[in-house]
């Protein structure tokens, strides 16, 4: 069998993937058990929302103010395994909102801000390489 160089080329192209796979495995391990406040409407519809996200590329969730869209949907995404290949981006219109939303999600997950959940506004980046959900302003 002649050596065409394809095997070596394949080895080189896949060699860089192993660290990525290890990082994915590490990121999957850090997700704590996820709970949902029963009083929030989004929590009650979590299975439907989860199925829609899993089955469709774009999902629009509409609900009343205070229904849990902002804080519970990132947790649903984590439960679906999102955030392993890259961060879950979560935008908020104002800096204070971005910070307080990140704080709330981190609190509900029982983690420190900047670990699994972080935020970035202007010149402040409170996140790390382990951050799975990053809340940020859209500007």
List the predicted regions and their residue ranges.
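Helicase-associated low-complexity/disordered flanking segments
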Residues: 1-58, 73-76, 80
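Conserved P-loop/Walker A NTP-binding site and adjacent catalytic elements of P-loop NTPases
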Residues: 19-21, 43, 52, 57-139
């Amino acid at each position: 069998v002649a050596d065409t160089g394809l095997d070596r080329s394949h080895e080189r192209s896949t060699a860089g993937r192993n660290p990525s796979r290890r990082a994915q495995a590490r990121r999957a391990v850090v997700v704590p058990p996820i709970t949902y406040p029963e009083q929030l409407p989004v929590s009650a519809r979590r299975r439907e929302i989860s199925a829609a996200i899993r089955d469709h590329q774009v999902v629009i969730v509409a609900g009343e103010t205070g229904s849990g869209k902002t804080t519970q949907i990132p947790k649903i995404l984590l439960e679906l395994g999102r955030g392993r290949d890259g961060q879950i981006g979560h935008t908020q219109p104002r800096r204070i909102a971005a910070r307080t939303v990140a704080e709330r999600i981190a609190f509900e997950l029982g983690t420190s801000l900047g670990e699994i959940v972080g935020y970035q506004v202007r010149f402040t980046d409170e996140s790390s390489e382990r951050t799975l959900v990053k809340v940020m302003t859209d500007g």
